[in-house]
Every structure is written in structure tokens, then in C-alpha cells.
Amino acid sequence: MGAYFLKKQARSPILEGFGRNIYALLSFSGQQYFIIAVCIYHFLLGNPSNFMNNDPNNHPLPGNFLGTIYKGGIIVPVIQTLLLTVLALSIERYFALRSAFGKGSLAKFVANIKAALAAGDIKKAQEICDKQRGSVANVVTSTLRKYEEMEKNTSLPKEQKLLAIQKELEEATALEMPMMQQNLPIIATITTLGTLMGLLGTVIGMIRSFAALSAGGGADSMALSQGISEALINTAFGILTGALAVISYNYFTNKIDKLTYGLDEVGFSIVQTFAATH
């Protein structure tokens, strides 16, 4: 176990090459994302050229999407922060999991390992792992080393050897899983938070609309329309952010489930091979 941990610290595929650069590029804090969102809101969406008479207090130009979003009000930068976070973490997770899967097809890797084990060729199985790399290959390599260690051990009974191999598989998997699941809880939180922020913006917009209706006993048409626009824009923006977060979370969770299933399949084959040949 200790040897596996040291090896992992020295060479983790998730922290290598392009994936490492992507992770460094996207490792902003929530505060930094908020600053970016505020800049987008004021300087891009709130650009005077998006509005009638070059005045952000007026209605957006007909068909001007940027000006329309700007009218969503103060909640828009908050929802933009959540949206930027989802997009950035989704990109980071994509490259991280691509590295975790290794260089080749996971299904083909599992099939090749099982074929090598069926032939009793542990050395070939290790060579396949060296070519594949990634988290799955790391776990299998660690388990195969324990396999060879138990083969040379003459003091332990067969049952304890099998338990030792199984334990090594579980511990190696437990070390890899946190990195594969990193940032997914944040995306899962945004699935709800994005919708709630949209709802908050909707409520604020409706409050402004009713305030315009009640002011002076008559309706200020511009204030009324701005309040309704704010409500609808925030609703749409919040739902969009929540939907993207749900899609991202489910996609990456499914990828991790496939990887875990592959590990379980290979691990079972290793244990069964040892049980059948010793």
C-alpha cells in the first residue's frame, strides 16, 4: 500500500501533461469567477451600444440578446458565476477523466487483461498496464504486484492470500476515486443553486413590477416592463444553468461508474485466477 501511494505521488496521470495545464488554468476560486461575471455584466452586457439611445436605462435594441440579459438585474452576475463555474469544472473533469481512463479503450484494456490472466501471463498483464496508464492501470498494476507477492509467500494460507489481494485492490481503488470525483459535489450543488438563484431573480422582478403598478395609483409602463423582463430573464438563465449542471454531473458520474465497473471486473478476474491456480 505504501509503495503504491509513493508511486502515485511521483506519477499521477491526472496531473501530467495537458491535463495538468488545464487543471491549473481552470483552478480559479469562486471569488475570481464572480469578478469575471461582474465584468461581463457591466462591460459586455451593459455596453451602451446594446440599448436605445446608447443608454443602459432604456430598452435593449430590438433583437439585442446581450442587452436583454443585462435587464435581468443584479442576480444575473450571480447566475453567471454559477454558469462559469459549471463550464470550467466540466472542462477540467473531462480532461481529468480522460487521463484516468488511460490511452486506449477501457473495454479493450479490460478484455486484454482478462485474456492475459486466463493464459496465466502476469508479466504480459503488467506490460498492458504500462501501455495503458491512467487510474485503472495504476490500480491493476498495484493488484498484480500484490498477486506476485502472494505467489512468493509460503507462510500464509490461500484464504489470507486472496484476502490480501482483494484488500490491495480496494485500497488502490480508494486512493484513485477521490481524484476522479473531485469537483463533482460542486457541480451537483449548482444543479439546485442555479435554479434557486433564477427563482430569486424572478421574485425580485415581480416585486418591482407590482411596485410600479402601485406607484401613484397608476402603472409606469417602463418600470413595469423592466420588472417583468427581469423576472423572466432570471428564470430562463437560472433554469439553463441548473440544466447544464445536471447534464454535466450525470455525464461524469456515468463515466466514473463505467470506470469503477471495469476495475471491479478486472479485480474479480485477478482474484479468481489466483484462486484457480494456487
Regions found by a protein language model. Give the residues of each.
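Cationic, low-complexity basic patches in intrinsically disordered or flexible, solvent-exposed regions
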Residues: 9
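Short, membrane-interfacial amphipathic segments enriched in basic
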Residues: 15, 53-62, 155-166
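Hydrophobic membrane-targeting segments
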Residues: 20-108, 252
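Helix-termination/interfacial motifs at the ends of transmembrane alpha-helices
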Residues: 39-62, 68, 177-255
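Residue-level signature of catalytic and energy-coupling elements of molecular machines
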Residues: 73, 87, 125, 140, ...
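Hydrophobic alpha-helical membrane segments of integral membrane proteins
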Residues: 78, 126-129, 203
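Predominantly long cytosolic amphipathic alpha-helical stalk/bundle segments
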Residues: 102-194, 208-211, 247-278
